[in-house]
């Protein structure tokens, strides 16, 4: 009997368009302040790039994503919802949404659950894994826009597939790392390669 391939899919920047929502919210709330266009975003933490632009902007940009309604109102990444549904329907495949809440979690946790229910349905709500440390979660693949995922486990069970986002598209990955350019890229090929490896175990 074939072993199932378990795919962990990050939420912000992979399923939900965090970066576009943040820029839109920042410009709406602070129209007179300088902002970082998406094509100039560098580094996973927007707060740090805004801090480098001007120190007081760090708290201002954080206030946007810490506000009620921010996570709930994020638009889906193009193709994400269809891809995850299709992936979940594949034989011998388990899909979980693996997402990290903010430290100021008061609004984001509930809104992440509501976002998933609204866009993917209640069956995916049961597949949410909420954790600050993704390295301790067992899986075969982690699709995530964060370029480096660290935690308690130095060698996590999953292979990290870097999902291309505005803040990481400039990074050159070593030959051993794989990247998914978008949901129209060939994610099925990545799953098939991992499935073949699982069957040889």
From Swiss-Prot:
Q: What UniProt keywords apply to this chain's record, in alphabetical order? A: Cytoplasm, Hydrolase, Magnesium, Metal-binding, Nucleotide metabolism, Nucleotide-binding, Phosphoprotein
Concerning CDD domains, the annotation shows: HAD_5-3dNT
Residues with PTM Phosphoserine: 182
Q: Does the keyword Hydrolase apply?
A: yes
Which Pfam family, giving just one, matches this sequence?
A: NT5C
EC number, UniProt record: 3.1.3.-
Residues annotated to bind Mg(2+)? 10, 12, 145
The main location class comes to cytoplasm
**Where does tissue-level expression of this protein occur?**
Detected in skeletal muscle, heart and pancreas.
Q: How does it assemble?
A: Homodimer.
> What protein family does this chain belong to?
Belongs to the 5'(3')-deoxyribonucleotidase family.
Instruction: Write out the function statement from the record.
Output: Dephosphorylates the 5' and 2'(3')-phosphates of deoxyribonucleotides, with a preference for dUMP and dTMP, intermediate activity towards dGMP, and low activity towards dCMP and dAMP.
| Protein name, entry field | 5'(3')-deoxyribonucleotidase, cytosolic type
Q: Which organism is it from?
A: Homo sapiens (Human)
Please name the taxonomic classification of the source: Eukaryota, Metazoa, Chordata, Craniata, Vertebrata
């Amino acid at each position: 009997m074939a072993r199932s391939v378990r795919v962990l899919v990050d939420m912000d920047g992979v399923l939900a368009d965090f970066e576009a929502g943040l820029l839109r919210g920042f410009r709406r709330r602070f129209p007179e302040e300088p902002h970082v266009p998406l094509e100039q975003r560098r580094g996973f933490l927007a707060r740090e790039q805004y801090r480098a632009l001007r120190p007081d902007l760090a708290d201002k940009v954080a206030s946007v994503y810490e506000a009620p309604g921010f996570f709930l109102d994020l638009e889906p990444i193009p193709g994400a919802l269809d891809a995850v549904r299709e992936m979940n329907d594949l034989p011998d495949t388990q899909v979980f949404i693996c997402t990290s809440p903010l430290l100021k979690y008061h609004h984001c946790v509930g809104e992440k659950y509501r976002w998933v229910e609204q866009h993917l349905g209640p069956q995916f709500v049961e597949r949410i894994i909420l954790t600050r440390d993704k390295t301790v979660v067992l899986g075969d693949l982690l699709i995530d826009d964060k370029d480096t995922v660290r935690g308690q486990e130095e060698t996590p069970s999953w292979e990290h597939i870097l999902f291309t986002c505005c803040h990481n598209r400039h990074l050159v990955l070593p030959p051993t790392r794989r990247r998914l350019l978008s949901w129209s890229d060939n994610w099925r090929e990545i799953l098939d390669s991992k499935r073949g490896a699982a069957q040889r175990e």
